[in-house]
């Protein structure tokens, strides 16, 4: 019988890109899930609903997949990190990158329901260290997207117009309804 590893991640996978991942300049869809983090830089005129979201760092997914191949027995494990909300992300980005404060979206407070998910079983069964914290994942994803943006600017892409583009904002919020237009 062949061993099977079936990844199931009911959360958003974020994290930095691999060094050889190439995104066509101006192609925001190429940012994939990192677009959610890039959306926080849409400017104060963009208002985000304060939704909670779970995440798993892409580096943790890779390690879990390899570890899953090596374990014996049948297991059902959830790949998830702690849940956080948009307001916490904005506050965290402000604390680590105060230079971005004028570029950050605003957040409308709403009531929060945070699902309870415990990654400790997966960590224990797979024999892995603690998963990447949401703060580290956000910081690394933010830096990766800013690096991409910097490369785009070098070849003439107007990053400001990308962030102001309602098509971009629609792509960012597709399925999440997390962008409220204020104009």
Segments predicted by a language model, with ranges:
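Conserved beta-strand elements of beta-rich interaction domains across eukaryotes
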Residues: 12-13, 84
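Mid/C-terminal beta-alpha module of Rossmann-like enzyme folds, strongest
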Residues: 51-55, 62-109, 119, 133-134, ...
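A conserved pocket-lining segment of Rossmann-fold NAD(P)-dependent short-chain dehydrogenase/reductase
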Residues: 26-56
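Glycine/proline-rich active-site loop of Rossmann-fold NAD(P)-dependent oxidoreductases
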Residues: 2-3, 15-33, 67-77
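Conserved C-terminal active-site "lid" loop/helix of NAD(P)H-dependent oxidoreductases
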Residues: 108-129
């Amino acid at each position: 019988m062949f061993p099977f590893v079936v990844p199931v991640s009911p959360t958003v996978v974020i994290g930095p890109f691999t060094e050889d991942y190439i995104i066509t300049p101006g192609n925001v869809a190429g940012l994939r899930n990192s677009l959610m983090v890039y959306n926080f830089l849409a400017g104060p005129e963009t208002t985000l609903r304060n939704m909670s979201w779970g995440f798993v760092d892409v580096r943790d997914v890779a390690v879990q997949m390899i570890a899953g191949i090596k374990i014996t027995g049948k297991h059902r494990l959830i790949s998830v990190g702690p849940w956080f909300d948009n307001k916490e992300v904005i506050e965290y980005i402000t604390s680590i990158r105060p230079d971005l404060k004028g570029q950050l979206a605003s957040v409308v407070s709403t009531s929060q329901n945070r699902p309870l998910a415990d990654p400790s079983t997966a960590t224990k069964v797979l024999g892995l260290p603690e998963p990447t914290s949401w703060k580290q994942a956000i910081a690394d994803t933010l830096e990766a997207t800013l690096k991409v943006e910097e490369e785009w600017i070098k070849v003439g892409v107007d990053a400001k117009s990308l962030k102001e583009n309602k098509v971009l904002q629609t792509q960012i919020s597709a399925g999440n309804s997390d962008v409220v237009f204020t104009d």
